[in-house]
């Protein structure tokens, strides 16, 4: 169906674009293309080799096998040992009354797992408060069972040598959870056994004072009324607990807030059968040690999904993601969720992460859930006493708030609160401990505050996360612990490899794009901007999957054509010429081009060929006639251009409503998006489904994309356009409607239109319907990248701006393996 090649007609259509009848014509191309043909064709990625794809396939299979036990059914969590909790379980005496431990294997584990420096803990991560708590706990249990004299001696020496140094972690908010509650209690026990430790250090007295202050604020009755975070550390407040009453807040699984240490302590005071049942179940699961939390099935699943999504490898694990999120959703409730399905206390980090991931995957979740995390004055609560945990909670709340739909005011409140908190936390983290630096805490906060989710580049996001993702990442509770299913070398290797493989595919496509562009005839229009790579980036940064190569290619062709038409209507063509060209488009008749000037004849031929090609490919993919659909779309689009040309010629500034109504069409986003989405391999869009994302005049995805693109463009280009004599922009139109307002006030008004439009776009994208999600995603991701392009300036007009760096990151520079 495609027409005669435009290039074959170049010789017969003699186009002298530098001079036409003595007219003085303007150009829209003050900034040349920075991505030359030779540069693009010099790119040679080794990752195009099949051996890398084969390795990626092996990794995908290995990860699927690894994740299967974690997400199937109730799952089998993998979590590192807690020497501290294991020591508490090792304290439990045999229930048959014999003078031996009920769980002797835990004592053996402690004897065999002391580190070379005399401490206990995770060897790969040193946090002194963690080591001190675990080491003193292990020393005390070995003394109880009168074993391990050498280990006891080495443990005491470690504590004596390091006890004073823990003050540094206190100053920097890097202590393990409830350290000031538990450690003084253990020290009192050690002192009663006459262990030779420096009990009179000023820091120890300070710690004891902090413990007393915290307990003084505690309502003793509330401990027994509703589950509270202190249930996690009951072993640290044995002196005040009424053991019979504490059973009223026991968890369904027999534990106290999923803590083996706390549960073991309660069992030793009460002999409760459910406590023992919980301890037995944990020992059966882990063998000869216990973790600091169990189960962590909800948090673990969410973190697995989050890492897979953020590393950009989610297309390989759609089944696993669905299973994990279905499981979380089954346990979702209006009060929020904890780290485990049986945890009676909602956790802000887990709830916010769950909300974001469930909403992103189109589950029905309400933001009203965050009301549970406000105090009596309506302010958000975030104070667990553990800095890293609080920051993780706020980061997740901040990210969740960016998925707001219209009218969800609580998410606006959450965003405001989290932003303020994170800015303050950033100052603190930059001067805090090496632990926070090792965990990339400052980087995470900075990036979150700098980069809005709606104005971010999906492939750059994946690359950045590969650069900060830590396979050995450790979390902090009462001890330092790791979740190997969540952070591991396989995820990182696949993330990097997959990024580079995709990039190598894109580089081959870029060569095809630049070759086509060079031969298309479009470079002959020297008045127009040449941005083939920027337009390829616009689609490839979001719709990057290999199977959508044709979608990317035709999208880029259309965008390149649109740029010539845009610059022709805006700057180069006379009003009489533009009227003829618009009529030629309306007639869809090549013979009518005889009335056009030579440069427009060539332009019309290229236009005719590209529209035919796109319509033909769309018809093949969708199985129905679409030429008339595309013809009407292009006609509307160019009529919008022509109306703006008339405004310019008449020096007319329309009302803002007039401007926006026309601008939604003349921005050209609708026809551009349709030229991609209808050609996505394997994605059938019935007419009914298509109308749910594309219906002129209705606020659906293409309409909202067009509105956002038009206004985002205006906020960064209106000054340059005004200098060229183009008077109509949303800012100028608003100032005409409101002569009393300043330019800054006009800009603020435009942003006040943009913000709710972005929320509407998010809702349209994420609401469940029968539209193929890949199609909605393509439309949505293109909007995100467009907002990036106009974030700091006119990224299309001046291709040397930040967009250049994004293109390099996304399409040029691979990740080192």
Curated annotation (Swiss-Prot):
Alphabetic keyword roster: Cytoplasm, Lyase, Magnesium, Manganese, Metal-binding
Effect of residue 713 to A: Abolishes catalytic activity
Pfam families: Terpene_synth, Terpene_synth_C
Top-level taxon of origin: Eukaryota
Enzyme class label: lyase
GO molecular function per UniProt: alpha-bisabolene synthase activity; magnesium ion binding; terpene synthase activity
Binding sites annotated in the UniProt record for Mg(2+) 1: 566, 570
Cofactor binding note from Swiss-Prot or TrEMBL: Binds 3 divalent metal cations per subunit. Can use either Mg(2+) or Mn(2+).
GO BP terms in the entry: diterpenoid biosynthetic process
Subcellular location as annotated: Cytoplasm
Pathway assignment: Terpene metabolism; oleoresin biosynthesis
Amino-acid positions noted as binding Mg(2+) 2 in the UniProt annotation, renumbered to this chain: 566, 570
Reaction(s) this enzyme catalyzes, per UniProt: (2E,6E)-farnesyl diphosphate = (E,R)-alpha-bisabolene + diphosphate
Cofactors (names): Mg(2+); Mn(2+); K(+)
EC number per UniProt: 4.2.3.38
PANTHER family from the UniProt entry: (E,E)-GERANYLLINALOOL SYNTHASE, ENT-COPALYL DIPHOSPHATE SYNTHASE, CHLOROPLASTIC
Family: Belongs to the terpene synthase family. Tpsd subfamily.
Function description: Converts farnesyl diphosphate to alpha-bisabolene. Involved in defensive oleoresin formation in conifers in response to insect attack or other injury. Involved in sesquiterpene (C15) olefins biosynthesis.
Record text about domains: The Asp-Asp-Xaa-Xaa-Asp/Glu (DDXXD/E) motif is important for the catalytic activity, presumably through binding to Mg(2+).
UniProt miscellaneous comment: The conserved 25-Arg-Arg-26 motif may play a role in the isomerization step of the terpenoid cyclization reaction sequence.
Protein's UniProt name: Alpha-bisabolene synthase
Origin organism lineage: Eukaryota, Viridiplantae, Streptophyta, Embryophyta, Tracheophyta
